[in-house]
A protein has these predicted regions:
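Bacterial N-terminal signal peptides that target proteins for export
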Residues: 1-9
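Bacterial N-terminal signal peptides
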Residues: 8-18
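Patatin-like phospholipase
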Residues: 19-66, 76-321
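Gly/Ala-rich beta-loop-alpha elbow adjacent to hydrolase catalytic centers
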Residues: 67, 71
């Protein structure tokens, strides 16, 4: 690993409380699962979706859309039936919610020390010990350290991204982790939480963004549990998974492969047909060195768009079942 901070950016680069568990089964035919991957992953997923749409495959018609971290942003837009052109324009905007062309407010901030987070994520990858307990350790650390972006600034940026504050009419869920005990939280329209706040909680990368407070609980990035949380779609007949972190040649990214493979097996064992889309060689080249690099949004969108068009024939067979 060239640097711990660079590697962990991949993760960013990943009511009453509506609590979901991996044992819950979903109903419906088609599930779209959008994984985390920072601003570059957000752009790539948006491009893939636009490319598929241009070939006649409308993923917004999914019976269930599950988004984690960057995928939560894309999923909320798609579930709201945002046109492909608007989806791409939104993906090109800086992460702080400023209009395209304006500098990201974090650009002058020093890189955070994420060595603790990296160590804990790699500990989780070994499969030893309680996964939830390790997530709780990460949550405790996230509440203790000084983030690059404060909670108020972070949540405000999501209110700018989603000014309507209303949940989409279609079934859409986003994933976060309770910082106190490491438990999974699945947010939906029935959770009684404003959409921007729920999505922000799914994107609150520990050490970079402050945990997000909802109903006296604090929440961190859903990617701490899984970069896709694909197992939560168990019970659906068909699942399409977009996973931008599965391609980058980085030690931490490779560590995500084992848990994702387990999630895909869980779906398959439940009788679900699964298709996984990961970045192709052209997309990987467009990504640059890290999924956290805002300057690679446009190349990632363009590469994803081409990849989506190229994948359309294969995806059409799955999506039409």
């Amino acid at each position: 690993m060239k640097s711990v901070s660079k590697a962990v950016l991949i993760l960013a680069s990943l009511l009453f409380i509506c609590a979901g568990t991996a044992g819950d089964s979903k109903t419906g035919d088609h599930a779209l699962i959008l994984g985390g991957g920072g601003p570059v992953g957000e752009a790539w997923e948006s491009g893939v979706i636009a490319g598929l749409t241009e070939k006649g495959i409308d993923l917004s018609r999914a019976d269930l859309i599950i988004g984690t971290s960057a995928g939560a942003i894309v999923g909320a837009r798609l579930a709201s039936r945002m046109p492909p052109s608007d989806l791409i324009n939104a993906a090109l905007a800086p992460s702080d919610g400023s209009p395209p062309g304006q500098p990201d407010q974090r650009s002058s901030s020093p890189p955070p020390d994420l060595s603790f987070l990296a160590a804990k994520l790699q500990e989780m990858d070994t499969g030893k010990g309680s996964q939830q307990s390790i997530r709780a350790e990460i949550g405790e650390w996230a509440q203790r350290v000084r983030p690059v972006v404060s909670e108020s600034q972070f949540v405000a940026s999501y209110h700018r991204r989603f000014p309507e504050k209303e949940w989409p009419g279609r079934a859409y869920e986003c994933i976060s982790v309770d910082a106190a005990d490491g438990s999974l939280r699945v947010w939906s329209g029935s959770s009684g939480v404003p959409l921007p706040v729920a999505v922000a909680s799914s994107c609150a990368l520990p050490g970079v963004f402050a945990p997000v407070t909802i109903n006296s609980h604090r929440y961190i990035d859903g990617g701490v549990r899984s970069v896709t949380n694909a197992d939560l779609a168990r019970g659906c007949k068909i699942a399409l998974v977009l996973a931008p972190t599965m391609g980058p040649n980085d030690a931490l990214a490779k560590s995500f492969t084992r848990p994702l493979n387990g999630e895909l097996r869980t779906l398959g064992d439940s009788g679900c047909k699964v298709e996984l889309i990961v970045p192709d060689d052209a997309s990987l080249k467009a990504f640059g060195a890290t999924l956290g690099d805002e300057t690679h949004r446009a190349p990632a969108v363009n590469a994803g768009r081409v990849e989506g068009r190229n994948m359309a024939g294969e995806i059409a067979k799955l999506w039409s079942d």
